[in-house]
């Protein structure tokens, strides 16, 4: 006769989801109840650890491990990270989000095994590369986003994406019909993005000054002669000027949905736009030393090719598309600066600003 090695077996399930709304248990729970009708079911009482998790600093570690880990010894930390630390904005956000995840990724160097496939991250990487390539081409040839014809823009996008796809991952993008479809989809996204950039710039007087502007800045000196650097790339810096001031707008391209969140910024979870603005202002001050450098906007452009429903004409379709492509983020509350970014009236289709009947801007401001 077989004997069980454990006295009791427990199966648990959540009563509430992440949004604290009630959720139904898995169908497996119902099956077990039918198979074992004598199984007892009860709600676990709140434990001290649950209260401690909410009320006591670092209690989450106590709850999950039962002990507080010691800080790495100096020698081990130096062996892992070295005396010169270089981190991206993403790595800073990772540390603020989960220090253990940061340790695994940047200390131990752990990562998922690479597979021969075209992943979601690759889609965004190629789109960024195409937008950068075409944007620099426009600037180097003294062309204008605003005046670029649809045919010329589409041709530049096709040439750029074909060249990048040919050299990407040993032609991984050419090995299936699905990936060929993705190439066409990326062309549509890139073309729509560059079209939107032209429309948005046409409504104001800001003009692109730099694309994919890299930076490497020493943050501070740490104990034991450790140096700390932050690196990154700013997707786009737009500027405009008057007699005394230079106004700076930072735009970051995202393939997902992103918006400025003050609470996450405060806790270090989303510091990208603020960091980019700081570096952009330093960069522009070196070029325009005699002017005051004024931040105008921190904006995300979410890359997409929206489909809209319209019953009237092409103008209505364009207006709806531009509304879907409106940038998100925060802008300077100065009305004159806002009009430099968008001189149109009413609710802007370019930036997160709308005007009331008293002609006062309703905005997200910095």
Kindly give the residue locations of the regions a language model identified:
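Short, small-residue-biased leader/transition segments that mark boundaries at the very start
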Residues: 2-6, 359-363
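C-terminal accessory regions
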Residues: 3, 7-36
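Structural signature of nuclease core domains in nucleic-acid processing machines
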Residues: 16-20, 36-358, 365
